[in-house]
Amino acid sequence: MIELDHVIVNARDRVASARLLASLLDVPWDETALGIFSAVYVNPGLTLDFITTDEDFPVEHFCFRVSDAEFDAILKRLEDAGIGWRGDVRGRNDGKVGTAHGGRNIYWDEPDKHRWEILTKSYARRPG
């Protein structure tokens, strides 16, 4: 089986971006895990390696499948942090939760404009 091991995430401030995501997801992180990277340990098999850059970089989208309890906890942490969210990939933050595809999902944008998503039921699986 092929598994995704790590992803490099560009940021204006790798430490601040990694710290914020780790706190929202309630996962461990390391400010200087690999020298120039601040690592967010999403799960035992996936690390997001944040790197600081002054160069232009594209806005990326990252989605995490979570349990209902994790969804509720992350939503509460977003609310406590004053970070807005929405139930649709486009549009303004309206505090709504998406319910398409038989689960719940929300999107939020972080300071570098990357678009983060959590969902309780994947809609991206190949049928069969």
Regions found by a protein language model. Give the residues of each.
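Short glycine-enriched loop/turn motifs at secondary-structure junctions
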Residues: 1-3, 55-59, 99-100
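N-terminal beta-strand motif that seeds the catalytic metal site of vicinal oxygen chelate
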Residues: 1-15, 61-62, 66, 122-128
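Core segments of cupin and vicinal oxygen chelate
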Residues: 2, 8-48, 54-55
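Short, conserved charged micro-motifs
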Residues: 16-18, 69-74
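Short amphipathic alpha-helices in soluble, non-transmembrane regions
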Residues: 22-24, 75-80
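Short beta-strand micro-motifs in enzyme catalytic cores
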Residues: 36-38, 60, 102-106
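Vicinal oxygen chelate
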Residues: 81-128
